[in-house]
Swiss-Prot record:
Protein name in the entry: Lymphocyte antigen 6 complex locus protein G6f
Subunit structure: Homodimer; disulfide-linked. Interacts with GRB2 and GRB7 in a phosphorylation-dependent manner.
Main subcellular localisation: membrane
Location in the cell: Cell membrane
Extracellular topological segments: 20-237
Glycosylation: residue positions: N90
Cited InterPro entries: Ig-like_dom, Ig-like_dom_sf, Ig-like_fold, Ig_sub, Ig_V-set, LY6G6d/LY6G6f
Alphabetically ordered keywords of this record: Cell membrane, Disulfide bond, Glycoprotein, Immunoglobulin domain, Membrane, Phosphoprotein, Signal, Transmembrane, Transmembrane helix
Alphabetized PANTHER family for the sequence: LYMPHOCYTE ANTIGEN 6 COMPLEX LOCUS PROTEIN G6F (PTHR32286:SF10)
Residue spans, topological domain Cytoplasmic: 259-299
Gene transcribed to yield this protein: LY6G6F
Residues with the Phosphotyrosine modification: Y283
Amino acid sequence: MAVLFLLLLFLCGLPQAETDSIQAIYVVLGEALELPCPSPPALNGDEFLSWFHSPAAGSSTALVAHVQVARPSRDPGKPRRESRLTLLGNYSLWLEGSKAGDAGRYWCALLGQRYRYQNWRVYDVSVLRGSQFSARAADGSSCSVLLCSVVPARSLDSVTWQEGKGPVKGDVQSFWGDGATLLLMCPGEGLPEPRAHKPGIIRCLVPQNKGISFSLAASTDASPALCAPSADWDVAWILTLLLTVGQGFTIVVLGVMLWRQRAQGAQHRNASFPQFKPEIQVYENIHLAHLSPPAPKTR
């Protein structure tokens, strides 16, 4: 009994490992991304580190990297040949040339006989992309339409449009939709003549100082006309069409992602990968279950 009491006291006295909440990460389409997985405060030496990816809620989970922590090697990453995911020497997950299909939830786990860090670091990765179009107002003046969208679709209320270090100058209108934001720029009234001839750089900024830069062509009209309000169907129809196309593209990309994950799951039905759980399982002693017999069932 004394040995059992000391064992329970030792287990209960172990400090809890601190962990961060789910982190939202933005990456621009085509850029690289590194997802860290730092070492936990305590390890037994028999843990295996794994990285998992779930592209959408309710979809199958894919194992993208698996290595034993106690046996470091020169090339610990073992990604698939067609994959652009690589496990670095510090156990971070490196994504090269991000695509829309790379969006989703990533998490690393360290599982052993004594310690089980099942959801040690969790990231929600969104891929940011931009598009640029031209529109013509009712009076014939040319307007620029800038579109920022994310996959998977999420609210973009925190997106800001900037020109240099300040707000965008001129006659501008911004619109927000599900997973997309749009900026309509028409030649402004009262701008100095040099400003009207210089090309501008407009940035769509999301949290973490990530963003997309748009280059506007120099204006050739010395006296730009004010963009007419929505008195004609030209600009309004183009805005509606762009928002519809953006949402349709998001739906198609998510459908392709789900189809690919189901196809991969059918090829690995015998493999069982742990699904993501919102709670964090930290320390677990598998020998504790053998210390006392199970309680008898009562009716």
